[in-house]
């Protein structure tokens, strides 16, 4: 597949999107101009403010303890979600950290991982991609609800969002030095 596209959006979750209330709250997603990526996760930078992502190992309410340090979504998946769920689907609403201006991809397209090529020419490997499992809270939100619906009422929607449509979680534990990512950096298959 080669080049997939440029990073359209970088964002962090200031706080977990489901806790403490139990429903999906996208107001905690913050778009940033750039972000520092380390083996522990992502720290967004906006107007000089450093915002630690909720999945970063050092966040006080860390989601995943650093095991889900970075996630990536694609414009093509957002187009598919918007066609199915309508106007509630805005770019970045699924909460992934990087949104790439590229087509919908399948897991088999990403077996070699992803590489971000920064404007400075630095290549950053994003290893071992795996589909982000869709949750009841996000799926209920897309359907216009607040309190999560029972799983048996969401079977078709959860199936639609699985396999990468909801985004991919990648490994960054191998990184040995911080790297700054910016909107416009190019993403390609590894």
Question: Where are the language model's segments positioned?
Answer:
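Metal-cofactor-dependent catalytic cores
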Residues: 1-190
């Amino acid at each position: 597949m080669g080049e997939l596209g440029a990073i359209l959006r970088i964002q962090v979750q200031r706080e977990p999107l489901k806790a403490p209330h139990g429903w999906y709250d996208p107001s905690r997603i913050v778009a940033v101009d750039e972000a520092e990526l380390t083996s522990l996760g992502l720290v967004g930078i906006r107007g000089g403010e450093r915002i630690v992502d909720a999945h970063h190992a050092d966040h006080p309410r860390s989601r995943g303890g650093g095991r889900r340090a970075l996630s990536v979504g694609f414009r093509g998946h957002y187009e598919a979600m918007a066609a199915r769920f309508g106007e509630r689907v805005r770019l970045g609403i699924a909460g992934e950290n990087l949104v790439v201006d590229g087509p919908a991809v399948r897991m088999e397209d990403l077996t070699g991982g992803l590489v971000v090529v920064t404007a400075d020419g630095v290549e950053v490997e994003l290893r071992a991609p795996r589909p982000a499992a869709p949750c009841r809270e996000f799926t209920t939100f897309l359907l216009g609800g607040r309190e999560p619906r029972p799983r048996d009422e969401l079977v078709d929607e959860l199936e639609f969002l699985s396999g990468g449509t909801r985004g991919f979680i990648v490994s960054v534990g191998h990184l040995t030095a911080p790297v700054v990512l910016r909107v416009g950096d190019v993403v390609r298959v590894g």
